[in-house]
Amino acid sequence: MEKTVTFYINRTTPAKLEEELVICKPLKRLTISVDVEKEEHTLMGYLVVRDEKNRIRIQKMLGYGERTIVIARHAKNTTIGGVPGPIGAGTWKIVIYLFAEYIEQTLEGVSLPFRIQISDRKTEIQETIGKCLWVDRHYREQLWLGYYNKSSFYSSRGRWYKGDFHTHTHLSDGKESVSSAMRKARMMDLDFYVPTEHNIIPTGWEDDYMLILPGVEITTKIGHCNLIGIDKMPERLPEIMEYADTPEVEEYLYEILREAKKREWIISINHPFLTIWKWKYGEVGLDDITCLEIINDPTYTDARESNDQAIRYLDFLWEDGHRIWGIGGSDSHNLIEERYKGSDKPSIAGDPGTYVFCPSLTPELLLKHVKQGNIYVSRFCTADVRITSQSKSFFPGDRMEDVERKIMMEIEIFGNELEEGITPVIWIVQNEKRIKLTTEKTKKGYRA
């Protein structure tokens, strides 16, 4: 079985392109090869394949990964983002959703061929789902992560666990393979990692050495937000991909955020003040937001100003009585040897690190303590935060009874990379007022 489909893409091409594929008899596999003139042209869009029962069998931004994609019976032979299982006879659909942001930036006055070759040939691929399959084989039209275990146990220690809530790999537009990204994550001493690809759901992971918490970055022209701890594909995600650059996207984003709240996923607003990617959607209620990304890829050229704005905005929200928690995200898209203009450091998972205190480490407990606000975000240093009152200990985010009480708070900051001659400035919000604390140097760091 062989078929070639060619799409010609320019700025006026509809955002959704679809071609039917008739499979006359069951196959062992479906092999899809993508041919473009330049490697970066694979960033033009998402590939979605639906089977004879209209079930999604793969969803992936073509990006920097392998240009040959395989759907097979088993996870070990199926490309990341795929759903393994039988290749049944009937009418399948090959769908391309164009990534409007890339089209707008690069395709002025040109039309590019986008060629897809489909066959049942056996082909070796490197980027397979791997050891851990999350997607339920008894899937419906939407993807369900029915095999993901939120009770998986990773550590019995009560401590601060370091992780990254905003990451990218070959599953969307990141330049790192999943394997390479995980090596870097271990190098950065991460305890947990959240894959948040642009409008793409991870269907599994290469191994379970580290706690991996499924997420997705809902990506539109009116802002980006992460949904963290998802157990299924958001119902309106296909419409988000199709209408991301149109006024209609507001309705679909509203529905996704309602679904996220109903299913108790974490909603985190990404880089809320970052140039063209700032948050512009005004219909979301502050009570619906769990987290605000206050440090997004600090190595990026425009990061300093936008991150400072995000931190100050979170202070304002706290002063106004809102309980929204600050988290960080590397938002890393690059290889470790690459640098943004003006930076001498790589954009890498774990920079910044977000630390979450958990009594032990499971996905379920991690989600619980993020929602409680037992969090701090850090770069180059760690913190020891001690809060006591009436002989009880508390963590950032914990609630105390609404009574008059004496509260003792001590914060110590440690780090070999703290710049010499620079003293950390520490503020707290107390009774909805921002207060600066006195800081002193110690043998190991600083204390307030």
Functional labels for PLM-detected ranges:
Residues 18-21, 71-72, 81, 437, ...:
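Exposed aromatic-hydrophobic patches
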Residues 19-38, 83, 92-97, 104-105:
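Hydrophobic beta-strand segments within beta-rich accessory/binding domains
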Residues 87, 95-161:
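Non-catalytic propeptide/linker segments at domain boundaries
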Residues 36-43, 100-104, 416-420:
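Extended, low-complexity, turn-rich repeat/linker tracts enriched in Gly/Pro/Ser/Thr and Asp/Glu
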Residues 65-92, 99-101, 448:
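Beta-sandwich interaction modules
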Residues 2-12, 35-78, 118, 122:
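Surface-exposed beta-strand/loop patches in noncatalytic accessory domains
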Residues 146-270, 275-288, 294-314, 335:
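A metal-dependent hydrolase metal-coordination microenvironment
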Residues 122, 135, 142-156, 222-234, ...:
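Charged catalytic cores and adjacent phosphate/nucleic-acid-binding surfaces used
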